[in-house]
């Protein structure tokens, strides 16, 4: 006959078997299950150990600023000051993330987003892309000119986060450590300092919408894009650890800077002398101040979310010829490899490289215009070569670039 439970008996921990008199506390659960304070403490320790291992796995292996610059040098020519500034900023950003994962400090480290200023084709986008590649984190590019306030025709700011999610294969944890580059940020400057009856839906309104993203918020992201599928389930993404890099040419801000410096040159003293020297700087953007950006049309709150401002210089002919030949994935190396697949050598004469660089400068396209220039020069060659088996080498001359003459062809020697 089965024993009938005796409720007057002393209860025991269901895990270690100790009685109530042997421990400080026993907690009762459903179905006559009990756990003592000692087993609770033991379980807590096991869980904490596992969480520590998980947190350690989340800590990024972080290259030093020197290592970041050295790797950037493999891909980016020139812009030494910008590379150094970005390397330090990115290192500190991900060091901050690692600290948040496994805290050791009493101080809360805040995020510092980055603004890049420089002419078209100076390498702003490419620098941001290269940083993401070096750090092996998800990367997305957004165009500020397509963004509008919620409720207006255009893209919601949440779509920026969607692009990062897509780059991370919808791994939310990976996306939350990614880098977003917002291009043409100068195009969302306020149209005027005067209040207008017509709403500036792609200017100040977008700046306001981006504010929370930049400082850190939990964004509700529609996985299929913004407004076409209103019933879709939203993905929650915390932007606190996403590094935002914004870039723009800021055409016209040089005039604002000169006006400010010019007003302060009048008079005597070291400040007046410094301002006079600044006015003669080849790149006046190096002297930009938050007040200049405010006058340009960015609201103070938005500028405050971009504490790091770095300036890229306009590329010279020397810079552009180096860009054509030196980086690991230089265009000349790419086209040489392409013709090599057809068993044909490719040579660019030095003055041809200078000529291509000059064309890019005249067109004000910078580095991004080099590929189209090469494509134009190489078009007929790349059309004909696959159909010929007698060509050993193609030589691109200065005349090929400037006058549109056909490249020189060296034919294979006919064996007797």
Swiss-Prot record:
Gene3D superfamilies: 1.10.8.60, ClpX chaperone, C4-type zinc finger domain, P-loop containing nucleotide triphosphate hydrolases
UniProt keyword annotations, A-Z: ATP-binding, Chaperone, Metal-binding, Nucleotide-binding, Zinc
Domain ClpX-type ZB: 1-55
GO cellular component: HslUV protease complex
SUPFAM superfamilies: Glucocorticoid receptor-like (DNA-binding domain), P-loop containing nucleoside triphosphate hydrolases
Binding-site residues for ATP, renumbered to this chain: 119-126
Similarity-based family: Belongs to the ClpX chaperone family.
Name of the featured protein: ATP-dependent Clp protease ATP-binding subunit ClpX
